[in-house]
Amino acid sequence: MSPNKRFKSARTLIGRPGAMVAAAALIAGCGGAAAAATGGLKSSSVHYATTPTSPGPINANAIPLGDGYLSTTPRVGYVDSCVTTFGGIGGARTDGPWINTKTKTWSDTTKIHVSGMVSWPDATYSVKVEGSKRVIEFDDLPVDHTSGTFPIQSTDPAYKYDQNGNHLAKQTFDWSLPLNPKPARKPSCTPGGPIGVLDDGVALFNALDGEGRDAGAHEVLDACGGHPNPADIYHHHDIPPCILRQVRDGTTKLVGYALDGYGIYVVKSANGTLPTNTDLDSCHGTTSVVEWNGKRQRIYHYVATLEYPYTVGCFHGTPIGAGGGSGPSGSGPGGGPPGGGPPAA
């Protein structure tokens, strides 16, 4: 797919009073269980899944495929999506050999990556507290790792499966999130664009690609689990390996923030395994004691898994922009945040 140059310098201001929310153009589809030291994951509010999940720690060679696990209501192991119609614009055109359609699993250990090691020395990412708000400003370029070479070159082995023709381009994201988020009256759906940001300074999207499939399985990403969409927004669909490696076994670490202000955490058991869907609620979160705002406290938070939907299945709190905006997009369908456009892998 050819890159959409009109949006290379687009400015996205979400959550600032009076700011234009220009999300519709920006989030077009892509071209592409053990308790930890913090006290564990179980809580009285947790709902238990039957599918899709595994009864124990997920085998990276046989991760349950998330295709079809899309809902318009919160469900454990699903993405509650604001988008219900998909345009078939995912970059991945051919299933790679890492996907086993018979067992409905995929292997993260044998999946190929986009080649290249492109540095971004001018990348910026800042988080600061202003009163009752957490202000996050970032340009969406990775601050602590390289990216692959995009567009994917025809000489790259990845090109056989994914012809992502988009570029990485500097963006301007300026978010004002609640410092102490509160549960919403009811959970809300996730849009097709940013649902949060990770601490490498890169936007986080939900688990769906432009065709409504499991993006982690189908889309060919770079070595740090990223790729750009047609608006040239570089993004992740899960917690990438370069961040997972930074979390020691038996510890819990805050690795990002969702649009509703809640934290996104990696929780590793003593032997290095991550929780599964059965440990988490319908929004892919739980309530337990973690480090938050400089102190240990019992709060709700999202938790990363190796299995779909990976990070945020729905919003537990009220995402910024949920009330609509003055820009061309307004709010997403179903009362979700702005930009209910087709997902990007």
Give each language-model segment a name.
Residues 171-177, 198-202, 229-243, 295-309:
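Extracellular/lumenal glycan-associated surfaces
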Residues 37-213:
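Solvent-exposed N-terminal domain segments of exported/luminal and surface proteins
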Residues 14-25:
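Sec-dependent signal peptide hydrophobic core
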Residues 33-35:
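Cleavable N-terminal signal peptides
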Residues 1-13:
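N-terminal secretory signal peptides that target proteins for export/translocation
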Residues 324-345:
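Disordered, low-complexity segments in secreted/periplasmic proteins that are enriched in proline
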Residues 212-222, 230-276:
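Short helix-loop boundary/capping segments
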